[in-house]
């Protein structure tokens, strides 16, 4: 059924198993969106999912971010809480977003492919809230992160961190148990 395919899509995007009630709510939102849009992308589905469950499961948390950009170069100073350990670093990159992502990678080493980086203004004007979508891939596992903020660079950092946190959850769910590992050895 369409609902079953939707449930499978949620799993492939890195969301933990939902209760049947929660899937029903999300599927209804998905159908409403599909009626309005010609194409529904993975990022659209991620927006529909309530990220409340992530708040208790975040390994990586953004504490602070300072960015300078201009004709003389870009650099980001980033502070993260990774499993209760506070770390701070500074990186330069090819633009402010690259600098931010390099900081995150230095503090939390990982090897992912950035498949998508997308920014959308939620409203009009210079004070508009930006929604950033990030899709990363690691060994065939795809994770989509999203965040919104009036500061596009803060939203970018939060979206990337959100994608990493979902990937960490996905790793935990697909890791072999001790029994499975022992049986394989």
Enumerate the language-model features and the residues they cover.
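Terminal or standalone catalytic/regulatory effector modules within metabolic enzymes
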Residues: 1-185
